[in-house]
């Protein structure tokens, strides 16, 4: 790495970041077990990983785990507000190129995505570790643009315009770059629901040119990170952002998937009166039987003190909803992208910045709303994201997925798959001792009776936890 081969806010924060890293390691037993298991065999030797995932302290432990088992790495954040600057500095100080600053512009964000594919020796990456599929999309859209430049001519949003400009800039600087880079990729492991949905859409359209592992739908990711992580980090973000008393307030959670379930529990645990919106009758019934009132936002927006989106969809909270809410209603999103709330429709109104990632927007009638993190992930923009322990489970899945794709690429086709059940159970097993959990062990007779082995796997792939 050259002296300039990183972009962080302040490299002087590295010592502070290292102290927090040391604490996080004690809460991330899965990643530490991976270092112990694979340090000798070095299964990722030769892997050149372009990583795009929130540059937090927990991610720093993931990065150093990948490095410890052989990988070369270049890293950027997957959200303009989610970087913890001391974490980025700690990683950069070790010689790993990282390009991440809290509060990036969109131009900087896409410049940094490009940078994770620009190795000093000029050779391409051969692996992607992604969160939201932006890094994957950058290479795939770029390779299509090298065949047909017209696809860059009609951006639909401001961010897409900036995205297309960065692709064009790289095409001009390095002709053929995207096509060569796409051909070199062995596989991608994807962290989040939104990114997985994008990959499945690419597969459906026949546009996925390499294997992908859906880390999000590992049970030890979606049923833990998405649920229990949000349960702790949502109210943390709201409180840090607003200092508002949550108890007694009416909160509406849009969506009751795993993230919605954790978010509703988070707000309920803080004393809020929680309502839920849903499109899916199964999830709606679950919410009702968990004790929440299931409503339509068109009818219920006027009752809300807090509205949180969790869906991964667009236009969930529209301008007409925001016109109905109470004065000083808090709006926030804990889904991946910023289009769940129609933030663009608010841009022509007066904005008052209260503090970083907290804005007050005033409507013509004088009513005000508080918007957290400009509609992006509030738990990472206004707070520090999920706790280390739950992220250890998610990131252990990422390590195992990278090893699978890099060492066993010939066993995978250009489709989206999930990790095998035995590896999912392994991830859980690695986290039991830290909580003092003692498993019951099946006898041979008991195992035979239910059709499993005493060592597992214990559930069929179709089992819903």
UniProtKB/Swiss-Prot annotation:
GO terms for cellular component: cytosol. PROSITE patterns: ADOHCYASE_1, ADOHCYASE_2. It catalyses: S-adenosyl-L-homocysteine + H2O = L-homocysteine + adenosine. Substrate binds at residues 56, 131, 191, 221, 225. The keyword tRNA processing does not apply. Signal peptide: none annotated. NAD(+) binds at residues 192-194, 226, 255-260, 278, 313, 334-336, 379. Binds 1 NAD(+) per subunit. Pathway: Amino-acid biosynthesis; L-homocysteine biosynthesis; L-homocysteine from S-adenosyl-L-homocysteine: step 1/1. Its cofactor is NAD(+). Its EC number is 3.13.2.1. Belongs to the adenosylhomocysteinase family. May play a key role in the regulation of the intracellular concentration of adenosylhomocysteine. This is Adenosylhomocysteinase. It comes from Bartonella tribocorum (strain CIP 105476 / IBS 506). The gene is ahcY.
């Amino acid at each position: 790495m050259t002296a300039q081969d990183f972009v962080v806010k302040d490299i002087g924060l590295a010592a502070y970041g290292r102290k927090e890293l040391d604490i996080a390691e004690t809460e991330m037993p899965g990643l530490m077990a991976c270092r112990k298991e694979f340090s000798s065999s070095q299964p990722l030797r030769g892997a050149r990983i372009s990583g795009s995932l929130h540059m937090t302290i927990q991610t720093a432990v993931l990065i150093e785990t990948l490095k410890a088992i052989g990988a070369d790495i270049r890293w950027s954040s997957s959200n303009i507000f989610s970087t913890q600057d001391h974490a980025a500095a700690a990683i950069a100080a070790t010689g790993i190129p990282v390009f991440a600053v809290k509060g990036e512009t969109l131009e900087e964000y896409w410049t940094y995505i490009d940078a994770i594919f620009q190795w000093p020796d000029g050779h391409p990456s051969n692996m992607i570790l992604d969160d939201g599929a932006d890094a994957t999309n950058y290479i795939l859209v770029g390779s299509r643009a090298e065949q047909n430049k017209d696809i860059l001519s009609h951006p639909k949003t401001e961010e897409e315009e900036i995205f297309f400009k960065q692709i064009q800039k790289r095409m001009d600087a390095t002709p053929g770059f995207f096509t060569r880079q796409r051909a070199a990729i062995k596989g991608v492991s994807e962290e989040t629901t939104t990114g997985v949905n994008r990959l499945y859409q690419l597969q459906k359209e026949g546009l996925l040119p390499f294997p992908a592992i859906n880390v999000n739908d590992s049970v030890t990711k979606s049923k833990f990170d998405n649920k229990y992580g949000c349960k702790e980090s949502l109210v943390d973000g709201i409180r840090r952002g607003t200092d508002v008393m949550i108890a007694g307030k009416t909160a509406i959670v849009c969506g009751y998937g795993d993230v919605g379930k954790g978010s509703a529990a988070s707000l309920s645990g803080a004393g809020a009166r929680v309502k839920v919106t849903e499109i899916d009758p199964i999830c709606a019934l679950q919410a009702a039987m968990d004790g929440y009132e299931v409503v339509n936002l068109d009818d219920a927006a006027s009752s809300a003190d807090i509205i949180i989106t969790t869906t991964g969809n667009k236009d969930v909270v529209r301008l007409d909803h925001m016109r109905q809410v109470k004065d000083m209603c808090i709006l926030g999103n804990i889904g991946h992208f910023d289009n769940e709330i129609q933030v663009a429709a608010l841009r022509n109104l007066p904005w008052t910045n209260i503090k970083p990632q907290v804005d007050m927007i005033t409507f013509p009638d004088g009513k005000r709303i508080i918007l957290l993190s400009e509609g992006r992930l509030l738990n990472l923009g206004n707070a520090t994201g999920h706790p280390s322990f739950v992220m250890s489970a998610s990131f252990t899945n990422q390590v195992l997925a990278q090893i699978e794709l890099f060492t066993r690429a010939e066993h995978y086709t250009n489709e989206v798959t999930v990790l095998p059940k035995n590896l999912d159970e392994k991830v859980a097993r690695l986290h039991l001792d830290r909580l003092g959990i003692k498993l019951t062990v099946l006898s041979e007779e008991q195992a035979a009776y239910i059709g499993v082995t005493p060592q597992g796997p214990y559930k069929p792939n179709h089992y819903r936890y």
